[in-house]
Amino acid sequence: MALEITPALSLLDEHHLLKEVVNEQKLTFENVTYDSRKVSDNTLFFCKGNFKPSYLTSALEKGATAYVSEQKYAEGMDATGIIVTNVQKAMALLGAAFYGFPQNELFIIAYTGTKGKTTSAYFAEHILAKATDKKVALFSTIDRVLGNEPDQRFKSDLTTPESLDLFHDMRAAVNNGMTHLVMEVSSQAYKKNRVYGLTFDVGVFLNISPDHIGRNEHPTFDDYLHCKEQLLVNSKRCVINGETAYLRDVYYTAKATTEPEDIYVFARKGAQISDNIPVDIEYQNDFEDLHKSVIEVKGLSDKAQTLHVDGKYELSVPGDYNEGNATSAIIATLLAGAKGEDARKTLDRVHIPGRMEIIKTKNNGTIYVDYAHNYASLKALFAFLKQQTHAGRVIAVLGSPGDKGISRRPGFGKAVSEEVDHVILTTDDPGFEDPMKIAQEIDSYINHDNVKVEFELDREIAIEKAIKMSTNNDIVVLAGKGEDPYQKIKGVDVPYPSDVNVAKKIVEEL
């Protein structure tokens, strides 16, 4: 790939980002990066984030010929300096241009929501894999799948990658023969302009509840909601969960840039929908247990009926809250050209790493491993499992990450108080915080009249305690980490076997 400086400057000027060019030269860039360790000859280097001038010095020594920044640097006096008003926006635009605008060669379904993004994205990816003969890429919190070969699947570092990485991966997916892409879009992706300039073919808004609010994330809930809603502003067609909080705000944000005939609202049958906003598609539970569920979906509006969505669908991922996730995936993929039969033949065999993973025992109940990590997702998970216990207990093992998401901790205590019988508070990516202080903070929000509370900071021992204390009718929930193979401690990813592997090993030894 290559990018000439003249069209690059024109693109920045078109978006009113270009302030000035220092030492302009006729250049062709053969590499783009924001990481000085990845610089090669003829690189366009981006000065972003926690930038130090020494990074620019290093980049120029390694072959960078120009830099993009919001200010001039003396260290770059011999190179071309492209000075912009917003380096994150500039990086997104020039990244797309460098990689040949790969988004134009993909049908893109994008998901946002406080909870359910990953599960919904996996549902949609499985349906499209059937519909397109496996020509679908997936960018999720768990995996980046760029093709069908083992070496084209990678673990994700961010829910939505930095823009240069995003467009690099899109180009790789196209080169690998992919025609469709399902991706998660976080609120931070809009906050930090990682998806600036992107228009999605279908944007799905699942839900919104207070989360990711704190010193390192969103300053207020209004800012969080605004960033979430930008997905709808930048989508050709919108799919909205009619049961979301702030539905009026969400719906009319979508309507500001999208014609009503291209907005599809779905909801559970009988749900109370605010402001008389019309529901296009409804779903209802036909069967559920601890291992699967069956939903019936029906199109109500004329536009919904043209999708031929009506029918029953069996889901291999249990949980009443996953029924709405599956419905959203069915609608989005039908808009992408799939058929209802594609969904019926795939939704009953979807496996999502770290989401409602079930481990059975002979005499110690059933173990569930789930990534649930905020009040909304924990409440939904615990409530569903409590309903299924048949007089047994719900025993939970959980903690809260350090350095971010501090506003989640009261919600953790609230969810535990409402649905859990016994909780062991433990370590979950404490970062630079004291894990005991985090656990004690969660504990301060727990109603001790309802819940027995223990502290065990060694997560493996906490899991062992929970499993060994459980009996046949009990359910053990290992929440928050899913299949994460590490603990983030003081800036280091410390290896950890994962909740799934720890639980399986303990069960084998019982």
From Swiss-Prot:
It is an enzyme of class 6 (ligase). One of its GO terms (molecular function) is ATP binding. UDP-N-acetyl-alpha-D-muramoyl-L-alanyl-D-glutamate binds at residues 36, 159-160, 186, 194. It is found in: Cytoplasm. Belongs to the MurCDEF family. MurE subfamily. GO terms for cellular component: cytoplasm. InterPro entries: Mur-like_cat_sf, Mur_ligase_C, Mur_ligase_C_dom_sf, Mur_ligase_cen, MurE/MurF_N, UDP-N-AcMur-Glu-dNH2Pim_ligase. The modification N6-carboxylysine is found at residue 228. It comes from Ligilactobacillus salivarius (strain UCC118). This is UDP-N-acetylmuramyl-tripeptide synthetase. Pathway: Cell wall biogenesis; peptidoglycan biosynthesis. Its EC number is 6.3.2.-. The keyword Ion transport does not apply. Keywords: ATP-binding, Cell cycle, Cell division, Cell shape, Cell wall biogenesis/degradation, Cytoplasm, Ligase, Nucleotide-binding, Peptidoglycan synthesis. GO terms for biological process: cell division; cell wall organization; peptidoglycan biosynthetic process; regulation of cell shape. SUPFAM superfamilies: MurD-like peptide ligases, catalytic domain (SSF53623), MurD-like peptide ligases, peptide-binding domain (SSF53244), MurE/MurF N-terminal domain (SSF63418). The gene is murE. Catalyzes the addition of an amino acid to the nucleotide precursor UDP-N-acetylmuramoyl-L-alanyl-D-glutamate (UMAG) in the biosynthesis of bacterial cell-wall peptidoglycan. The keyword Calcium does not apply. Carboxylation is probably crucial for Mg(2+) binding and, consequently, for the gamma-phosphate positioning of ATP. ATP binds at residues 113-119.
